Amino acid sequence: MSVSVIIPARNEKGNIEALIQRTPRMGKHTEIIFVEGNSTDDTWGEIQRQGAHYQEYYHIKWVQQDGKGKGDAVRKGYSIATGDILMILDADMTVEPEELPKFFNAIASGKGEYINGSRLVYPMEKQAMRFLNLLGNKFFSLAFSWLLGQNLKDTLCGTKVLSRENYLRLAANRAYFGEFDPFGDFDLIFGSAKLNLKFVEIPIRYRARTYGETNISRFKHGWLLLRMTFFALKKVKFT
């Protein structure tokens, strides 16, 4: 099996080289796909420089997203991916690239079909997740678990893995939930549940960010997630 690692990157210039150096080679072939989105710190220039520098040693692609939001960036990356297995890795490196082989082994062995990271099992580094964010994550995990009939500890972890084949099936049915999810979590989780894919969670260690600032707004994005949850409630439980 070949692997595509999709890395959405906005204002993550200081992490680009480390992401290339530390992303493991998995399966018969691994490609790294950076999707840059509306950065103000020359992330796009850094991706091009480091991508060209390391191209002899790694298979690297880079592209700029057309719209806004992580979900749009992920879909852009998927559109140019060639791997049998599609992985998402956040560019902030709060989940370390070295964790990815756990996800590869889970899907390649047939243990699961939709592999989701869980940051809420191991103790976190100090400052890795603010208290209100932690409460929000636990709330949405409970809400999504009830909606889907799945026991999910961390629905909003950015590291997610599924096969290219299943993603294409999911994308073909996307109209059921629509495309208003700017994060991509809702799209993948509910789409995978609708396809009855086997869910597996992989505990990972969540690190504090060492470069830049978070792209997440607690209240704005929390309210949007709440609206998405109620939308799913109507779709899943009452239709």
List the predicted regions and their residue ranges.
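Conserved donor nucleotide-binding strand/loop of the catalytic core
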Residues: 30-34, 44-80
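Hydrophobic helical membrane-anchoring modules
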Residues: 1-3, 173-239
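Short beta-strand/loop segment that forms part of the nucleotide-sugar
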Residues: 7, 20, 29-39, 63-64
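Acceptor/aglycone-binding surface of glycosyltransferases and processive sugar-polymer synthases
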Residues: 65-80, 97-178, 182, 209-226
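Short aromatic/hydrophobic "clamp" motif used to bind/position activated sugar donors
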Residues: 86
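A conserved acidic beta->alpha catalytic loop
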Residues: 36-45, 93
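Donor nucleotide-sugar binding loop of glycosyltransferases
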Residues: 12-15, 39, 70, 96
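Short, well-formed alpha-helical segments that are part of the catalytic scaffolds
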Residues: 12-25
